[in-house]
Regions:
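N-terminal export leaders
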Residues: 3-7
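Bacterial N-terminal signal peptides
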Residues: 10-18
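Short, glycine-/small- and polar/acidic-enriched structural segments
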Residues: 27-177, 181-187, 201-206, 211-212
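Pocket-lining segment of extracytoplasmic ligand-binding domains
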Residues: 92, 170-261
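Ligand-binding clefts/hinges and TM-proximal coupling segments of bilobed small-molecule sensing domains
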Residues: 142-158, 238-270, 312-314, 323-329
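Secondary-structure end/capping motifs
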Residues: 226-307
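Conserved C-terminal helix/tail region of periplasmic/extracytoplasmic solute-binding proteins
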Residues: 297-336
């Protein structure tokens, strides 16, 4: 009995220590609300779910609630209002919000390269065939609108030469029904659409058309970062760790993507292969100065930011938070 008591007592002390320090107790984790721009997520957006499912968030001391929305603009608005602690949105839209003094900054860009395609119906064979066609967008200034106008500009087609048609976030049904002639689809959406209608085809891969404009950027409110810097350092570090996990653990990543993106495993696997081949996901902070400045300048060029309101790199990026977050994580060469 005496020997058993000696064994149990240290165990109880250790258990109490774990509760005191937070190890092994979810009560000690820092709560954080994170917004994702699509419902359900696409494969490219799966990073926070990977961080949650693999325990990376917990390792960093975070208890993250992931909420989904019907577009990146809604995420940005909820971060600005304070309803969300952080979330992911289009890098260009974030630049516009920063120019309007919204009080936000970028933490990391888990997917700095576009993961989208301009998928078109069979009546469009070449870029000039876009003239007079119905271009599917969610709302003016939204992700699909920005990318569609980007493609038109590259092809020398004026906005007034096409018809912009507002649709819901789910682009595939109206494309299949002929309500629109084009849709901005992520690679997994494109594969699903082509299985239903083989005549649909990809006119543009945006990671090739515009490799320097930032795509999926995680933002947070400046006031919240100033009040709780450690919380946001943990988030940034966890997301970078999740990206690195994904590059070296295909099977688990595909499993998580299939579960949360509600995809057949083979489509999730095909999307994974396309995204990793194109290096769409970053392995560092993803916020290279040249790409941040390119994104800002692009928004000035298209008239979404007035020249006298143009933000600087330092206005866009939460530099001190990122620097502290990534201490001890060696930079991966040849990746953003």
């Amino acid at each position: 009995m005496h020997r058993r008591s000696l064994v149990v007592l240290p165990a109880l002390l250790l258990a109490g220590l774990a509760l005191w320090t937070g190890r092994g107790s979810t009560q000690q984790l820092i709560k954080l609300k994170f917004g994702n721009p699509t419902t359900p997520p696409n494969t490219v957006h799966i990073i926070p779910w990977v961080a949650k499912e693999t325990g990376i968030f917990a390792e960093e001391g975070l208890d993250v609630e992931i909420l989904t929305f019907e577009g990146g603009l809604y995420v940005i608005r909820n971060v600005v209002s304070g309803a969300l602690d952080a979330g992911g949105g289009p890098g260009a839209s974030i630049a516009v919000s920063i120019a309007r003094k919204a009080g936000i900054k970028a933490l990391v860009s888990p997917a700095p390269r576009f993961a989208s395609t301009l998928t078109v119906r069979s009546n469009i064979k070449k870029p000039e065939d876009l003239k007079g066609k119905k271009i599917g967008i969610q709302e003016v200034g939204g992700f699909a609108d920005i990318l569609s106008r980007m493609a038109l500009r590259k092809f020398g087609i004026k906005p007034e030469e096409v018809n912009f048609v507002p649709i819901a976030s789910a682009d595939v049904p109206p494309l299949l029904a002929g309500a629109i002639d084009t849709a901005i689809l992520h690679v997994d959406q494109m594969e699903i659409a082509r299985r239903k209608e083989p005549s649909l085809h990809t006119l543009v891969k945006f990671w090739e058309l515009e490799p320097n404009q930032l795509f999926y950027v995680v933002l947070a409110q400046e006031k919240k970062m100033a009040a709780e810097p450690v919380k946001f350092q943990k988030l940034a570090r966890a997301l970078v760790k999740a990206n690195r996990f994904m590059y070296t653990n295909k099977a688990k990543t595909v499993e998580i993507a299939a579960k949360y993106a509600q995809l057949p495993p083979d489509i999730a696997a095909a999307a994974y292969d396309e995204l990793t081949r194109a290096k769409v996901w970053s392995q560092n902070d993803g916020l290279r100065r040249d790409k941040v400045e390119y994104t800002i300048n692009r928004m000035v060029q298209v008239g979404n930011i007035k020249p006298d309101a143009k933000p600087k790199y330092e206005d866009y990026v939460a530099g001190p938070i990122i620097e502290e977050a990534l201490k001890g994580l060696p930079r991966i060469p040849d990746f953003d």
